[in-house]
Design a protein with these regions (language model features):
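Divalent-cation
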Residues: 1-155
Length: 155
């Protein structure tokens, strides 16, 4: 099962692992690699529709986990007539984290996770120094990925 690992940009630098579907993983990977399909895929279409209707994605927020399922929100703002985006979202739409991330990487929107969610489900990232053996670090990470399950992150 594919997994997205979100990392805190500063501070403790915890990881938030989220299991996602293969189609969504492919959509995220395609966008991150800068690959453009000959015709728009679902998340490309969503990005186009936002622009056509004068809205932009201000940010996404991974908000909570319930019964081993993560939830997210799209924070949309209407583009002002002068082209500036407002600070507060005009619309907040609930969605799957994988769809939110796939859309965010397409439009360059920031990705956030609720602090209490990271406190609850986040995993401490290993501290890597120049002295650490890269092979050992990779083996530990592979072991983590191969053995992780949704129950590991449930409250």
């Amino acid at each position: 099962t594919p997994m997205v690992l979100l990392r805190e940009p500063e501070g403790r630098r915890r990881l938030l692992p989220i299991l996602i579907g293969t189609a969504e993983a492919t959509a995220i990977h395609t966008s991150l690699e800068g690959l453009e399909p000959p015709r728009p895929l679902t998340h490309d279409l969503m990005a186009i529709l936002l622009g056509e209707f004068g809205a932009s994605l201000a940010r996404i927020v991974i908000t909570e986990v319930r019964d081993h399922t993560f939830y997210a929100e799209l924070h949309l703002v209407a583009t002002d007539t002068d082209g500036a985006d407002g600070d507060e979202p005009d619309h907040v739409i609930s969605c799957r984290p994988s769809d939110a991330i796939a859309l965010a990487v397409r439009v360059g929107a920031p990705i956030f996770a609720a602090e209490d969610l990271v406190d609850e489900c986040g995993q401490e990232a290993a501290v890597v120094s120049d002295d650490d053996d890269a092979e050992e670090i990779i083996d530990e990470f592979r072991d983590f990925i191969e053995n992780v399950s949704p129950e590991d992150f449930a409250p």
